[in-house]
Amino acid sequence: MASNKTTLQKMGKKQNGKSKKVEEAEPEEFVVEKVLDRRVVNGKVEYFLKWKGFTDADNTWEPEENLDCPELIEAFLNSQKAGKEKDGTKRKSLSDSESDDSKSKKKRDAADKPRGFARGLDPERIIGATDSSGELMFLMKWKDSDEADLVLAKEANMKCPQIVIAFYEERLTWHSCPEDEAQ
């Protein structure tokens, strides 16, 4: 039975936990408690690991070739297969694993949150414009806020005409007519 120990070098490089004579100081060994997730980055498989004796905040992504815990990896992969067969759908990655309830709650909270001029903030400038919804809208940056909101152009024209004018002036380009150049 192979150990779940993984050796970390000073530069974060890992090697097999088997004992080797090293002229430098002995690298510290960490024990993998559980494999939590799997991903592929630049064609290399990485596993998200829970380290024994450490908190979840210390969990890390580690390349497969640096690990010496085949039983834990196999157990994780088997649980993934069982989950896929049971669900009949692809398992979500750790970053996407929020429950549907929390997602719908976030959507409700976002819908309840005031947007645009309803936030009571002063407009700073217009970042961009779109008519993808069928009506012209401006992406408005607000003073004293890092957030921007889409606001109806009609509303911006009424509430902050100088900011709308400044937005259009920034984008104006002048072209001279050929007959003007001849004079």
Swiss-Prot record:
<feature type="cross-link" description="Glycyl lysine isopeptide (Lys-Gly) (interchain with G-Cter in SUMO2)">
    <location>
        <position position="154"/>
    </location>
</feature>
<feature type="cross-link" description="Glycyl lysine isopeptide (Lys-Gly) (interchain with G-Cter in SUMO2); alternate">
    <location>
        <position position="10"/>
    </location>
</feature>
<feature type="modified residue" description="Phosphoserine">
    <location>
        <position position="95"/>
    </location>
</feature>
<dbReference type="Pfam" id="PF00385">
    <property type="entry name" value="Chromo"/>
</dbReference>
<feature type="modified residue" description="Phosphoserine">
    <location>
        <position position="93"/>
    </location>
</feature>
<keyword id="KW-0805">Transcription regulation</keyword>
<dbReference type="GO" id="GO:0005721">
    <property type="term" value="C:pericentric heterochromatin"/>
</dbReference>
<keyword id="KW-0832">Ubl conjugation</keyword>
<dbReference type="InterPro" id="IPR016197">
    <property type="entry name" value="Chromo-like_dom_sf"/>
</dbReference>
<dbReference type="GO" id="GO:0005635">
    <property type="term" value="C:nuclear envelope"/>
</dbReference>
<keyword id="KW-0539">Nucleus</keyword>
<dbReference type="GO" id="GO:0048511">
    <property type="term" value="P:rhythmic process"/>
</dbReference>
<feature type="modified residue" description="N6-acetyllysine; alternate">
    <location>
        <position position="5"/>
    </location>
</feature>
<feature type="region of interest" description="Disordered">
    <location>
        <begin position="1"/>
        <end position="28"/>
    </location>
</feature>
<dbReference type="Pfam" id="PF01393">
    <property type="entry name" value="Chromo_shadow"/>
</dbReference>
<dbReference type="GO" id="GO:0042802">
    <property type="term" value="F:identical protein binding"/>
</dbReference>
<feature type="cross-link" description="Glycyl lysine isopeptide (Lys-Gly) (interchain with G-Cter in SUMO2); alternate">
    <location>
        <position position="5"/>
    </location>
</feature>
<dbReference type="GO" id="GO:0006974">
    <property type="term" value="P:DNA damage response"/>
</dbReference>
<feature type="compositionally biased region" description="Basic and acidic residues">
    <location>
        <begin position="82"/>
        <end position="125"/>
    </location>
</feature>
<feature type="region of interest" description="Disordered">
    <location>
        <begin position="79"/>
        <end position="125"/>
    </location>
</feature>
<dbReference type="GO" id="GO:1990226">
    <property type="term" value="F:histone methyltransferase binding"/>
</dbReference>
<keyword id="KW-0007">Acetylation</keyword>
<dbReference type="GO" id="GO:0035064">
    <property type="term" value="F:methylated histone binding"/>
</dbReference>
<dbReference type="GO" id="GO:0005637">
    <property type="term" value="C:nuclear inner membrane"/>
</dbReference>
<protein>
    <recommendedName>
        <fullName>Chromobox protein homolog 3</fullName>
    </recommendedName>
</protein>
<dbReference type="GO" id="GO:0000792">
    <property type="term" value="C:heterochromatin"/>
</dbReference>
<dbReference type="InterPro" id="IPR038033">
    <property type="entry name" value="CBX3_chromo_domain"/>
</dbReference>
<dbReference type="InterPro" id="IPR000953">
    <property type="entry name" value="Chromo/chromo_shadow_dom"/>
</dbReference>
<dbReference type="GO" id="GO:0000779">
    <property type="term" value="C:condensed chromosome, centromeric region"/>
</dbReference>
<dbReference type="GO" id="GO:0031507">
    <property type="term" value="P:heterochromatin formation"/>
</dbReference>
<feature type="modified residue" description="N6-acetyllysine">
    <location>
        <position position="44"/>
    </location>
</feature>
<feature type="domain" description="Chromo 2; shadow subtype">
    <location>
        <begin position="121"/>
        <end position="179"/>
    </location>
</feature>
<feature type="cross-link" description="Glycyl lysine isopeptide (Lys-Gly) (interchain with G-Cter in SUMO2)">
    <location>
        <position position="21"/>
    </location>
</feature>
<keyword id="KW-0678">Repressor</keyword>
<keyword id="KW-0597">Phosphoprotein</keyword>
<keyword id="KW-0090">Biological rhythms</keyword>
<dbReference type="GO" id="GO:0005634">
    <property type="term" value="C:nucleus"/>
</dbReference>
<comment type="function">
    <text>Seems to be involved in transcriptional silencing in heterochromatin-like complexes. Recognizes and binds histone H3 tails methylated at 'Lys-9', leading to epigenetic repression. May contribute to the association of the heterochromatin with the inner nuclear membrane through its interaction with lamin B receptor (LBR). Involved in the formation of functional kinetochore through interaction with MIS12 complex proteins.</text>
</comment>
<dbReference type="GO" id="GO:0001221">
    <property type="term" value="F:transcription coregulator binding"/>
</dbReference>
<feature type="modified residue" description="N-acetylalanine">
    <location>
        <position position="2"/>
    </location>
</feature>
<keyword id="KW-0677">Repeat</keyword>
<keyword id="KW-1017">Isopeptide bond</keyword>
